[in-house]
């Protein structure tokens, strides 16, 4: 037969209760020492009997050190729990505020769109109308400003294009002028070149005069002795002249 589960309850018999306390206390102190030695743990055990007698155990007999450490830990834990509780409360409060603000904004947006106006009275409708008129004024003012800026930008571009056009027209006129001068120069250049070549050739080949030379064979000596000199003009042949003028 297996051992059944023992129900824990207060021992009514005073003597039996005292004997049980003595046995369990000794076993508890022994277990505290074992866990301290085996597991290198800091253990502090405090027991008060029904008569108020103190029984204690502390690792390395440093009860004050362990209790001080316990107090620091307990205080830090309490502060952390308190801070978390305050933070959670603040977050809940902030959430409620933001939620109400979002609902108000959504409601105002619907009113501006002309929706859900049944809940508004005459004064609220007048305020809404004034708000819409002010909004329209700001919108129109901004629209006019943008249109004016656009017009100024177009005028600036127009002026820039006009200046570029003037520069291009000036360059075109100069180019046409140069081309006209070039054509005129090309037309006059052949005549000037021909006249210069003919003049230079005539200077290089002057007319040759032959006089006072002895008579060639077959001529009459009397004609020579008569004292009349013979002048012979030697000119260029026609083919050479046509070549020079050509």
Curated annotation (Swiss-Prot):
This is MADS-box transcription factor 14. Its main location: nucleus. GO terms for biological process: cell differentiation; flower development; positive regulation of transcription by RNA polymerase II; regulation of transcription by RNA polymerase II. The keyword Translocase does not apply. CDD domains: MADS_MEF2_like. The keyword Ligase does not apply. Residues 1-61 form the MADS-box domain. InterPro entries: MADS-box/MEF2_TF, MEF2-like_N, TF_Kbox, TF_MADSbox, TF_MADSbox_sf. Keywords: Developmental protein, Differentiation, DNA-binding, Flowering, Nucleus, Transcription, Transcription regulation. Pfam families: K-box, SRF-TF. GO terms for cellular component: nucleus. Highly expressed in sterile lemmas, at intermediate levels in stamens, and weakly in lemmas, paleas and carpels. Residues 88-178 form the K-box domain. Gene3D superfamilies: Transcription factor, MADS-box. SMART domains: MADS. It is found in: Nucleus. May interact with the K-box of MADS1 and MADS6. Residues 180-199 are annotated as: Disordered.
């Amino acid at each position: 037969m297996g051992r059944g589960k023992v129900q824990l309850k207060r021992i009514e018999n005073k003597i039996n209760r005292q004997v049980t306390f003595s046995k369990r206390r000794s076993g508890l102190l022994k277990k505290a020492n074992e866990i301290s030695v085996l597991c290198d743990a800091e253990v502090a055990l405090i027991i008060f009997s029904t008569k108020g007698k103190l029984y204690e155990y502390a690792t390395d007999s440093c009860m004050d050190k362990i209790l001080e450490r316990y107090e620091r830990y307990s205080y830090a834990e309490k502060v952390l729990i308190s801070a978390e509780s305050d933070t959670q409360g603040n977050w809940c409060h902030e959430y409620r505020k933001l939620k109400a603000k979002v609902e108000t904004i959504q409601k105002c947006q619907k009113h501006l769109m002309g929706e859900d106006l049944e809940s508004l009275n005459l004064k609220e409708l007048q305020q809404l109308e004034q708000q819409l008129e002010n909004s329209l004024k700001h919108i129109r003012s901004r629209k006019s400003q943008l249109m004016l800026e656009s017009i100024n930008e177009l005028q600036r571009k127009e002026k820039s294009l006009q200046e570029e056009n003037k520069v291009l027209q000036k360059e075109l006129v100069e180019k046409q002028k140069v081309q006209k001068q070039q054509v005129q120069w090309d037309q006059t250049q052949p005549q000037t070149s021909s006249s210069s070549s003919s003049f230079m050739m005539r200077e290089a080949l002057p007319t040759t005069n032959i006089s006072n030379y002895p008579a060639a064979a077959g001529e009459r000596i009397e004609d020579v002795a008569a004292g009349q000199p013979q002048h012979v003009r030697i000119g260029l042949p026609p083919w050479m002249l046509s070549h020079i003028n050509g």
